[in-house]
Amino acid sequence: MFGLINIGFGNVIAGDRIVAIVNPESAPLKRLKEDAKEEGKLIDATYGRKTRAILISDSNHIILSAIQPETIAQRFMQSFFEIEEQLERIRRKG
């Protein structure tokens, strides 16, 4: 259960739809990026900067981000813990 996650430059994604956050340097991921571009499933959120992370969604969309994978993963965990805290407060009241 995740909320919206900031992936840089004011771009946010639905955290629940992301399957993987990976480093873009390997040849298979470069091919994956090119295939997504050909299929019209590539979303470039880098604003012209170097791609540092590739996010893979459950709909097979490929999202490029200029933020490091580790930073995005930390934002996922922060979002998860914030939602868990809110749910716990609701449970205590109810």
From Swiss-Prot:
InterPro entries: RemA-like. It holds the Pfam family RemA-like. Belongs to the RemA family. NCBIfam families: PRK04323.1. PANTHER family: REGULATORY PROTEIN SSL2874-RELATED (PTHR38449:SF1), REGULATORY PROTEIN TM_1690-RELATED (PTHR38449). This is Putative regulatory protein Tmel_0100.
